[in-house]
C-alpha cells in the first residue's frame, strides 16, 4: 500500500509544520495518525541531534485514542519526548472520549501540568475521580467563562483567570470563537 508514499506540498524543514488530518477519511485515519506520529518523532530526533528544542502540539488528541495502535504510539512518544528535548502539548474538547482509553487515563494522571477549562458534567465527574479534584475546585470549571479554569501543576490545583480584553490586538490574534474573523 503506497497511499502515503507520494510527494507532498508540505515543507517539513520549515520552523513550524502543520499536519492537518481534518479531511482524512475514516478508513485511512488510523494509518494517517500513525504516519503523522512517525513524522513528528523523526523531526524530534533530528532536532535533538542539532541541539534544538521541539514543541509538539496535538489538537483533538481524542482521535489518537479512538484507535489502539495510534494511542499506544502516542503514549510512548509522550514518555520519551521530554528526554529528547521536546515538549508535547495535547488539547481536546472531548475529555470523556479521551478517558475511555486506559492509555489516555495514564497520560492524564501522569501529566505534570494540566489546564482545564469549562467542562461538561460527565467530563467533570471523570476528571474528579482521576485527578482527585474537589467539588469546590470543580466549581471553577462548571459554566466557566472563556479564560477561566483550573491549573494543575504537580500536586497543586488552583483556579485561574486569564481573560484578554476584546479590544486588543492580542485578542484578535488569539480568539478561537467561531465567526470572529478579526485579523
What are the residue ranges of the model-derived segments?
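P-loop NTPase motor domains
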Residues: 1-86, 99-102, 140-144, 149-155
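H-loop/switch region of ABC-family ATPase nucleotide-binding domains
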Residues: 92
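P-loop NTPase motor core of the ASCE superfamily
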Residues: 96-183
